[in-house]
């Protein structure tokens, strides 16, 4: 299989072909996802909750991300691999570049950062140094203490700010954007306005791609289950069939449905 590239995702957007992505944290699942046709994977700081058992993503370190990135890369050598820069890993441009280098050397093709227009200079600095960047707007889990919990973002007056943040990130050189827990109407406005691919999670079926935390997709998340999550394993019966069903429902626009969306 040829390596999956950012250019391929750009082509998907231009041709209006939806694509499925998912989080991965180890060799075995990365290989399974790649074998079944998910060719874009994220080593997310969500591992702090799903793998390490913390109540937020905040304790995750750059070293944690690098460790799991190496494992995922071994399992999916041709996948486009995104890696989160975790909490406080990009407080200054110098720190950001050093930490981005760590996860890129571990096997990432792109780093993902949470934040809006205030990150533009950092995104521009990375892009100028050949580090591809994926932005992340809406519900940004590293800011959970500021938001007062895991809540829908971008409603009311905040919608225009978030829209302008998206434009600023693209202008600064971001090549992908994740939108999390925002109203469908805002997600469509942003997706239509940007030339770069937009990946949604809790943003309706109007984005170019979708992403799920793998534990949510298989119904093994403990405690609160997000509204946007769907247990594909319950319907499919086995993990490989669940992955194929997830891909098919994303590509056809069946998932996410109205019951998984916000307004």
Swiss-Prot record:
Belongs to the PanB family. InterPro entries: Pantoate_hydroxy_MeTrfase (IPR003700), Pyrv/PenolPyrv_kinase-like_dom (IPR015813), Pyrv_kinase-like_dom_sf (IPR040442). Signal peptide: none annotated. Catalyzes the reversible reaction in which hydroxymethyl group from 5,10-methylenetetrahydrofolate is transferred onto alpha-ketoisovalerate to form ketopantoate. It is found in: Cytoplasm. One of its GO terms (cellular component) is cytoplasm. It comes from the Bacteria. GO terms for biological process: pantothenate biosynthetic process. The gene is panB. The active site is at 180 (proton acceptor). Its main location: cytoplasm. Keywords: Cytoplasm, Magnesium, Metal-binding, Pantothenate biosynthesis, Transferase. Homodecamer; pentamer of dimers. It catalyses: 3-methyl-2-oxobutanoate + (6R)-5,10-methylene-5,6,7,8-tetrahydrofolate + H2O = 2-dehydropantoate + (6S)-5,6,7,8-tetrahydrofolate. It is an enzyme of class 2 (transferase). This is 3-methyl-2-oxobutanoate hydroxymethyltransferase. It comes from Klebsiella pneumoniae subsp. pneumoniae (strain ATCC 700721 / MGH 78578). Transmembrane segments: none annotated. 3-methyl-2-oxobutanoate binds at residues 45-46, 84, 112. Binds 1 Mg(2+) ion per subunit. Its EC number is 2.1.2.11. Pathway: Cofactor biosynthesis; (R)-pantothenate biosynthesis; (R)-pantoate from 3-methyl-2-oxobutanoate: step 1/2.
């Amino acid at each position: 299989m040829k390596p999956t590239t950012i250019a391929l995702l750009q082509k998907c957007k231009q041709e209006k072909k939806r694509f499925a992505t998912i989080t991965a944290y180890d060799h075995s699942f990365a290989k399974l996802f790649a074998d079944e046709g998910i060719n874009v994977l994220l080593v997310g700081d969500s591992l702090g909750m799903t793998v390490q058992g913390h109540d937020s993503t905040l304790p995750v370190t750059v070293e944690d991300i690098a460790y799991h990135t190496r494992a995922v890369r071994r399992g999916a050598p041709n996948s486009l691999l995104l890696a989160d820069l975790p909490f406080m890993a990009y407080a200054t441009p110098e720190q950001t570049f050093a930490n981005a280098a760590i996860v890129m050397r571990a096997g990432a093709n792109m780093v993902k950062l949470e934040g809006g227009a205030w990150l533009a200079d950092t995104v521009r600095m990375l892009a100028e140094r050949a580090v591809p960047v994926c932005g992340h707007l809406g519900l940004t889990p590293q800011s959970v203490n500021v938001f007062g919990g895991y809540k829908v973002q971008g409603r009311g007056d905040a919608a225009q700010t978030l829209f302008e943040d998206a434009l600023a990130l693209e202008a600064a050189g971001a090549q992908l954007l994740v939108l999390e827990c925002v109203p469908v109407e805002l997600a469509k406005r942003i997706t239509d306005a940007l030339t770069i691919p937009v990946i949604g999670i809790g943003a309706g079926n109007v984005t170019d791609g979708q992403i799920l935390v793998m534990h949510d997709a298989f119904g093994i998340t403990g405690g609160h289950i997000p509204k946007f999550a769907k247990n594909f394993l319950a319907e499919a019966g086995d993990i490989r069939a669940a992955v194929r069903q997830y891909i098919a429902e994303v590509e056809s626009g069946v998932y996410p449905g109205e019951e998984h969306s916000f307004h």
